[in-house]
Amino acid sequence: MREALQSLLVALQFLTRLPVRLSAMPTPEQFGRAVLCYPLVGVLIGVVLYGAARSLDGTPPLLQAALLLSLWVALSGALHLDGLADMADAWVGGLGDRERTLAIMKDPRSGPAAVVALVLVLLLKFGALAALLGAGRPGLLLLAPWLARSSLPLLFLTTPYARPGGLGQAIAEHLPARSLPWVLGVSFGLALAFGLSGLLALLVTLMLFAWLRSRFLARLGGTTGDTAGALVELTECAVLVALAL
């Protein structure tokens, strides 16, 4: 139980900006075990968003959507948005070359592709949030962060890490590979409790995952922290839009 709680705290500290205090810097092994808790972190983010949505009942849907999206970004500290921006720049500027793509991902500067990607994703999220809230379906907000963070363990489990060194490789080397399939099965299975909406969200998540993973392998031969962050943002966006249509 103590080890499970430690893994959850490490996952919360890594994936969110919630005030989690650890007694010491987590070891690579602890970072690896924490991947088991990524889906739960997604659920917690969804619960916070749902609670915020209910507390804003009566607020005009557009304003409510803007406030919730701001909270959503604040909860993650824009961690995954940063990965999306880096990947967008690298994919455009890399011109199909692996080493050039990896080099651009490490460049802290943002180019036009990064800005456009961020604007489009945030705009789509805002529109989908407004539609869901306007339709009185705030409970579906749970699905996007939950399934997006469930896709991360699936990515680490099935895809080699493309860049040597760093935290990403440490996580990849210490994955609890025997436990992860069970966790993923439970996480994806529970999404079906939302009925047809859950099934739709799950299908969108898995189809997008398969396509993005194939792109990562074709360009990089694996994944990186930036592509993992992009996977989260694009999955959240796709699930929200699919549910809002």
From Swiss-Prot:
Major subcellular site: membrane
InterPro entries: CobS
Topological category with respect to the lipid bilayer: Multi-pass membrane protein
EC identifiers of the protein: 2.7.8.26
Any Pfam family matching the protein: CobS
Cofactor: Mg(2+)
GO molecular function list: adenosylcobinamide-GDP ribazoletransferase activity; cobalamin 5'-phosphate synthase activity
Keywords: Cell inner membrane, Cell membrane, Cobalamin biosynthesis, Magnesium, Membrane, Transferase, Transmembrane, Transmembrane helix
Residue spans crossing the bilayer: 31-51, 61-81, 113-133, 138-158, 192-212
Listed GO CC annotations: plasma membrane
Enzyme class (EC, first level): transferase
Cell compartment(s), UniProt: Cell inner membrane
Pathway: Cofactor biosynthesis; adenosylcobalamin biosynthesis; adenosylcobalamin from cob(II)yrinate a,c-diamide: step 7/7
The UniProt record lists the keyword Lyase: no
Gene Ontology terms: biological process: cobalamin biosynthetic process
Catalytic activity: alpha-ribazole + adenosylcob(III)inamide-GDP = adenosylcob(III)alamin + GMP + H(+); alpha-ribazole 5'-phosphate + adenosylcob(III)inamide-GDP = adenosylcob(III)alamin 5'-phosphate + GMP + H(+)
Family: Belongs to the CobS family.
Annotated function: Joins adenosylcobinamide-GDP and alpha-ribazole to generate adenosylcobalamin (Ado-cobalamin). Also synthesizes adenosylcobalamin 5'-phosphate from adenosylcobinamide-GDP and alpha-ribazole 5'-phosphate.
Matching NCBIfam families: cobS, PRK00235.1-5
Classification via PANTHER family: ADENOSYLCOBINAMIDE-GDP RIBAZOLETRANSFERASE
Name of the protein: Adenosylcobinamide-GDP ribazoletransferase
Gene coding for it: cobS
